[in-house]
Structures are given as C-alpha cells and as structure tokens.
A protein has these predicted regions:
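Extended, hydrophobic alpha-helical segments in both membrane/secreted and soluble proteins
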Residues: 171-176, 205-209, 323, 393, ...
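Beta-sheet entry/capping signal
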Residues: 65, 72-75, 109, 164-169, ...
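Core structural elements
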Residues: 140-146, 160-182, 283, 350
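Active-site cavity-forming subdomains of large catalytic enzyme subunits
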Residues: 1-135, 145-162, 183, 192-194, ...
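Catalytic alpha/beta core of large soluble enzyme barrels
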Residues: 101-103, 143, 147-148, 214, ...
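Catalytic-loop motifs flanking and including active-site residues across diverse enzymes
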Residues: 108-111, 167-173, 201, 319, ...
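Ferredoxin-type iron-sulfur electron-transfer modules in oxidoreductases and energy-metabolism complexes
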Residues: 189
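Short, positively charged, Gly/Tyr-enriched micro-motifs
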Residues: 186
C-alpha cells in the first residue's frame, strides 16, 4: 500500500512494540488446570486475592493465538524457575531480562560472555574439552573481577549485583559445531553432545567459583542461602551423572563434565561459591557475527542460504560457511564438496544436490526452508541443555508460516512438561519487520560466500 516497512524505513516505526519481548509467567497450578480442563483464579499481584476466574484452556489458547499472530507472548514457567533458584532466602525470582535467559533476584544484573564452540572442534573430529575447561576458567575469573570495576544504572542494582555476583557464561555456534561433526540438530547424538558441553561449561564455572571463594570469599548473600545453593548444585550434578551418552563424541565430554561437578561439590562444600549464578544461553545475535559464527547461541542455522535486511534498504546474502567442513567430515571428495556447495548457493537447499546422499540430508536441516527442523526438535534441544544452566535459554522455536495455533499451544505445553524455564515461538513472516529470511525479497547488495 505504499508503506516503507523495511528495517529503518520511515513507516516501520508506526508499528509499535515490534522490537519488544513480551512474556507471560505461568505456574504449575495453572498448567495442571490446563491439563485437567479446569478453571483457574487470576490473582492480584499486590493483595493476592482472586480477581477473576477463567477457563485455563481458553486463556492458554488466547496466548497461543497471540503468538501465532505476532510471536508474542513468550512463556515462562514460574515454579521451574524458582525450583532451580540458589537464593530463595533472599527473595524469589519474579522476572527476567527481555530475552528471558537471565533470571534472578529483583534489582540485579548479569554480565554475559560467550564462547565460539566451533573453535574447540579438533581436526580428528573430537571436542577439545581440555582447552574448553581452561577457557571457561579464564572467562569466569575475568567476569568475576569485572564486577568490582563495573558501573550500574541504579544503586540498588549495583548493591544486589555486588552482593550476589551473578555471571552469565554461555556459547554460540552450537548449530555449526553439530553440522561440522556430522550430527543432525534434531537427533539424540546432537542433543547429547549439546547437553554434555553445557554441563561441562557450568560445572567448570561453579568449580572455579568455589576456588575463588576459597581465596576471596563467597558472595555476600551465600551464608543465608548456603543450603539452597548446595541443593541446586547437587541437582545439576545429578542431572549430569544420569545422562546417557549416544556417541563416543559426547561420552568423552560427559566424563570430563562429571568430574568437574564432583570437584565443584567437594570444593564448594568447603569454601562456598563466589557467584550465585554462573551460566545462561544468550541470543548472541551481535557478538556471534563478530566472532564469525554461522549460528547464534543454541540455535541451528536459520537457513543454508539466508538474506539479512540492511538498514537503509537492500539485503545481504549469507551462505553457511560450515557446509564444506561438514561434507569433508562425511567423507565427500573436494570435487563433490565444491559441487554441493555451489548447488546450495544457487538453490538455497540441499535436496537433489549432486552427489549428496539422502541419508545425510538431516545434518543440514535448518530452522527455515523446505527441510526445516520440527518445532519439537527445537524444544527437545532446549530440554537437553536446561538442567545444566544457572539461568535459562534465549531461543526461538521456529515454525513455518502455515503452522497452526494448536501447534503453538502444544509447544508451550511440552516446554513445561520437559522442564524448560522459558521459550518463545516465531511463525515465519508473522512480523512485517523480519530481519532474516530464507528468501531474497530485496535486491542483494553484498554476498558472503561459503569458504571452500
């Protein structure tokens, strides 16, 4: 209709709240009412009185309908969040940051840092757990020191952060790591490797935190929360110890992770911990690009070939740079590798690529496109990693444009059943200002070629 709705366009600002994240917090009581098709009392936040009684399924359906239409609201599971809370004696967790990965005390903050997982993939195809542990140790130490020199927007935020010293180490490029390892994102092998790496990261972080506590003391709020903090550490450790490996690749990482959790509990029992929280999985949308990552956070690749809208008009074609590495891992020759990459760049997908075996198709499945990962594939990946995080996971469960409201409702329900703390959904093309897509839609001004 003549409106300029591109990113940075003069008319896009008329569509308010397009760049805001809105979530609804639900309790176990509400979810059980949904399961049993019962009524639920909506409670006033200040007084605690029931102000309206509604049909739980009707309200849940309205949430799904809204998310179908515009990708909001996301959902947060209150009881799960607070069951993994290390500081309940200080206060409950009432809210999160906008992306829903940092969940802690009111008036607190958390510095974030992320590791590029693909950098730890060795030439023989194994994951370099030894150097990963060293990197986590270094970053956790540096992040804790940074709190001493940080400025905060308000005095209460500064006071709470210095007293509880929450940290948020995480990672990016998981999707690329799995692809380069010849593992499908939506596979038991992919999920178990992701879970093992996440467990290793958080176990190492808390072990280092306990060591720091022995030198400079535990966080100020530890004494009153010692029992709860220790309980949560044991929950993490037990989840790691009970994990079942699928491949030799994840088995090796689980072994190192479990040793880290054992040391974490042993040292923490003596010293306490320096930090109330240690890990989250953030979106890494900006820093992931700066680290030359193909995939952000815990996400799979959006598409093998994608188009990023540019502020001011036009778009940039981005071809996944991990494809050649994955094909080499799978045993394809250089000549076949080059032909497949060229086919993908021209066609945007791998179907009928010359020389590519159909049994390898799922390794290249992405969030969007002809061969897209199912919604539950996203949710199961989150569930594989959530038990090994202090905070939550900022992740989008991508659905095709023809997805139904019922499918979104199922995603929200299964997220609760699988023990997630939060999740968000995005149905393709449900927003007018969509920065990434798997189709051009605008003249290409620049091309990022795949590395050969």
């Amino acid at each position: 209709a003549g409106f300029d709705m591109d990113l940075g366009g003069k008319d896009i600002i008329s569509v308010q709240y397009q760049n805001a994240n809105n979530s609804v917090r639900v309790s176990d009581e509400f979810m059980r009412a949904y399961e049993n098709n019962e009524k639920f009392g909506l409670v006033a936040r200040a007084s605690g009185e029931v102000i309206e009684t509604v049909e739980a399924r009707e309200l849940f359906r309205k949430m799904a309908e809204a998310a179908w239409a515009c990708a909001d609201p996301g959902i947060q599971y209150d009881d799960t969040i607070n069951d993994w809370h290390t500081n309940p004696e200080t206060g409950r967790i009432n809210a999160s940051n906008p992306c829903s990965e940092y969940m802690s005390l009111d008036n607190s903050s958390c510095n974030l840092a992320s590791l590029n997982l693909l950098k730890f993939l060795e030439s023989n195809g194994s994951f370099d757990a030894k150097n990963f542990v060293k990197s986590v140790e270094l970053i956790i130490t540096a992040m804790d020191i940074s709190i001493c020199f940080a400025d905060f927007p308000t005095d209460p935020i500064g006071e709470t952060t210095r007293n509880y010293r929450q940290l948020g180490i995480g990672y990016a490029n998981l999707g690329a790591l799995l692809m380069a390892s010849g593992l499908a994102y939506d596979s038991d092998g992919g999920r178990q490797l992701a879970g093992a790496i996440t467990s290793l990261m958080t176990g190492t972080s808390y072990r280092r935190s306990a060591e720091l506590a022995g030198i400079v003391g535990p966080y100020a709020g530890f004494a009153r929360n010692a029992q709860a903090h220790t309980r949560v550490m044991k929950k993490h450790a037990n989840a790691s110890a009970s994990a079942k490996s699928v491949t030799s690749l994840d088995q090796d990482v689980w072994q190192v992770a479990n040793k880290e959790w054992e040391k974490c509990l042993e040292i923490g029992d003596k010293n306490g911990w320096r930090n109330a929280q240690a890990s989250v999985l953030a979106p890494t949308g900006t820093i992931g690009l700066m680290m030359d990552c193909d995939t952000t956070g815990i996400e799979p690749d959006l598409a093998l070939v994608k188009f990023k809208k540019l502020v001011g008009g036009g778009s940039m074609q981005i071809v996944n740079q991990t494809i050649p590495q994955a094909l080499k891992k799978l045993g394809y020759s250089d000549e076949t590798n080059e032909a497949i990459v060229e086919y993908i760049a021209e066609n945007g997908n791998i179907i009928d690529a010359p020389g590519l075996k159909p049994e390898h198709y799922d390794i290249f499945d992405c969030a969007m496109g002809i061969r897209s990962i199912s919604a539950m594939g996203h949710v199961k990946m989150m569930a594989a990693c959530q038990p090994f995080l202090s905070g939550a996971i900022s992740k989008t469960v991508n659905l095709p444009s023809d997805a139904t409201v019922a499918e979104i409702e199922e995603v929200y329900y299964e997220g609760w059943k699988l023990g997630l703390k939060a999740l968000a959904v995005y149905r393709d093309n449900c927003k007018v200002g969509q920065p990434l897509s798997d189709s051009k839609g605008a003249p290409t001004d620049a091309v990022a070629e795949a590395a050969h």
